[in-house]
């Protein structure tokens, strides 16, 4: 996948701020610090398209990125960050739910989880939310380079078991360090935006 264009378009907190365009949208969701920004930067072959931060909970808006004039990535706020106030978390929740359930351009969601650990309660809640609303989902298990190759199957099985993963969904093991899983991620994303056309 050759990336000729990858640019930040705008940030939004409400539907009247969403950019007007005709591209299919793919949202990226996951726990704070799961590696969403690193995932976006790596698959788009850019060093700082999405800002990475050592401070969890940094993304507080819906951030729209135009990729090749073909896809609009939408980075949604990371969830599960304890140091953000309850009011702030609820505000994010409403913003995300509003976007995920009402945006007609949305073709699906890339849900990022950390392959090293069992998915959190928040991860399971998000996966169930997407299944409930019949929003197509790709589960991307990040930080693949942090576990031994001999342990991969065990970790993948644990993630799937905890999520009660639906085999009709796509699962990609991914490393932003080595780019392993990058091609598989693009294949899954393209399948998402071309299904039902």
Swiss-Prot record:
GO terms for biological process: division septum assembly. HAMAP family: GTPase_EngB. InterPro entries: G_ENGB_dom, GTP-bd, GTP-bd_ribosome_bio_YsxC, P-loop_NTPase, Small_GTP-bd. This is Probable GTP-binding protein EngB. Residues 22-195 form the EngB-type G domain. Pfam families: MMR_HSR1. Keywords: Cell cycle, Cell division, GTP-binding, Magnesium, Metal-binding, Nucleotide-binding, Septation. Coiled coil: none annotated. NCBIfam families: GTPase_YsxC (TIGR03598), small_GTP (TIGR00231). Mg(2+) binds at residues 37, 59. Necessary for normal cell division and for the maintenance of normal septation. The gene is engB. It comes from Exiguobacterium sp. (strain ATCC BAA-1283 / AT1b). The keyword Nucleotide-binding applies.
């Amino acid at each position: 996948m050759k990336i000729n264009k990858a640019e930040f378009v705008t940030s939004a907190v409400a539907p009247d701020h969403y950019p007007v365009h005709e591209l299919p949208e793919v949202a990226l969701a996951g726990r704070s610090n799961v590696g969403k920004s690193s995932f976006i930067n790596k698959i788009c072959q850019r060093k700082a398209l999405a800002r990475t931060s050592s401070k969890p909970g940094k993304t507080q808006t819906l951030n729209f990125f135009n990729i090749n004039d073909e896809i609009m990535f939408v980075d949604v706020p990371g969830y599960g960050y304890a140091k953000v106030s309850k009011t702030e978390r609820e505000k994010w929740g409403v913003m995300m739910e509003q976007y995920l359930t009402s945006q007609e351009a949305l073709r699906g969601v890339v849900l990022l989880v950390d392959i090293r650990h069992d998915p959190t309660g928040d991860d399971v809640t998000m996966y169930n939310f997407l299944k409930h609303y019949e929003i197509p989902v790709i589960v991307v298990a990040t930080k693949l380079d942090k576990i031994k190759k001999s342990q991969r199957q065990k970790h993948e099985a644990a993630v799937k078991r905890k999520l009660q993963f639906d085999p009709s969904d796509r699962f990609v093991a991914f490393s932003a360090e080595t780019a392993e899983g990058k091609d598989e991620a693009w294949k899954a994303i393209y399948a998402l935006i071309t299904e039902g056309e």
